[in-house]
Amino acid sequence: MLFTPGGGSYGNPSLTDFYQELSSGRFAWDGQVSNWTPINGTKADFGANSEAAGDGGDDANGPVSRVVKATLDGLVASGNYGGIDIAKVDKTDRYDCDHDGNFNEPDGYIDHFGMIHAGEGEDANGGPDAIWSHRSYANPNDEQGPTGCKMGGYQLGDTGIWVGDYTIEAENGGMGVFAHEFGHDLGLPDYYDTSYGSENSTGFWSLMSSGSWGSYAEDPFIGTSPMHMDAYAKQYLGWLDLKTLNAGDKATFKLGQAERDMRNNYQAAAINLPTYQRTEKPFPTDGSDQDYLYSGKGDSLDRKAVRTLSGQLASDTPVTVRANYDIEEGWDYAYLDAKVGETWKHVATSASSAESPNRQNFGNGITGTSDGWQDITGTLPAGTTAYRLRYWTDGAAGGEGIAIGDVKFGSTDDTMSDTSAFDLGGWRKVTGGQFTDTFHHWYLAENRAPVLQDRSLCGAYQFTTASWVEKHCYAKGIVVWYRNEGVRDNNTYFHPGQGEILPVDSHPDRIITPDGKFLWSGRWQAWDAPFSLDKQSITLTQAGVGSKTYTAEPVTTFWDSSPTAYYRSNLQFNSVKTAGSDVRLRVLDANADRSTYTVQVDKK
């Protein structure tokens, strides 16, 4: 299923086949599979959920990433690393640890480390003690790791080879879950609403959403043959033959199928929009002091502002940091670090704690809320040659971050009116309590059809009972996506109508269940998203009620006439607020099998 061309005994194309198809032959990969490796512990030791985290938390007994260490210990105990040739596992420097611009060199970490655990995954109804399939980073810190690239993780015995990034899936997992998690390993986010408060419009249109659970129409299972990635994911990875335009350009061209490079036709079109600005007010100023250093906010951050001293401190020196912070308590942390020799030490302060309820405090971390500006005191150790302000967040939720107004010790008084002495490392200077950012956004149009692996678009499913699904075809045609860099996730529950990458539904009005009482899920609200020349229909069954046929009349024109042209307040989580750019895309013609559409882009 993983690397064998044709999938071997799996019967469907392998993961290697799938990614070669996704990339239109631009990406090829191979790997090694170890023998089954016993590890110490039960599935509950690694997969049980805390009450606070709920389903998929896998954190009741500590971070689930401890399974990485247990697996590495098991590989060492096997005597031959489970049959893995470790000379072949480190070829790239994926984060450019030595900052030389060369990613094609070893960095001491296994390039891609995946684990398959026995039994079912929690994500496939394996029970609350099972591990939820995911991609993450094990034991992140900057004190452990190979020489020259200390990014945490765990070492494989004493080989000098470490594991940081990893994925884990269940032994009965379908290829879709493996493909989805590998997508994360390549840098792609989840497209579904990870708050689980709503369903956005991505549905089965992307591997990084429900598309990971796709299968062929005739397949009695789900998740065995995922849908393709969306146009933005392929653009991000450089896997598209792309037509690029700017808003206001007028052009007529042909779009071939997004699922393959047809050479003579484009796979997708990108329409770049004028940038826009937004003013943020993260923290108020501290009295008359107008300037502060700000960490920023977001998921999976590790920002480090470094101030190198002109010499080293001769003795332990009291330090006072003026700060205001709002940090997700127990999960995200800020640190005051001191560099002594070549080692960074986490300084204990009046606001820090050594407690680590979720095993994410690297030591002396600051978390929670300060309720305004306060003085944080501590001691920089003798021999300090630099200090560092660090803000680290995990992959979900989060607060506003932390603001630093002043750092005082000895004769040094670093007010933030001048930050030129800092290597900011992602932090920014804020004046007057606000700053303005500029964001890029654009539309992507792709021709989607149930062909090649994407024939799983005719295996889109919905449950009619707890263990029975019916399958239907998503509509064919031109799917228009709105990519907005000013929105950091697709959690429309928190920002209705807005996401980082969402498909615009050509039929944005609500679809109601046969009894007239409920909305169909977001997956089915978006079934008719494409702009098309054709009338298309599906028949959906509501358990205990009956079936109803829903018809989508042809809609040939996408016209971004206003930000709410395709947004419905009574479908706020599933419809999309667009840019209001006046851009227009018209479907003019198509060949008989709809493998090629002629489209025109202009501005009305």
Residue spans of the language-model regions?
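Extended extracellular/luminal ectodomain segments enriched in beta-structured repeat modules
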Residues: 300-304, 311-322, 329-331, 383-386, ...
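Beta-strand acidic-aromatic groove motif in beta-rich domains, primarily in extracellular
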Residues: 329-336, 398-402
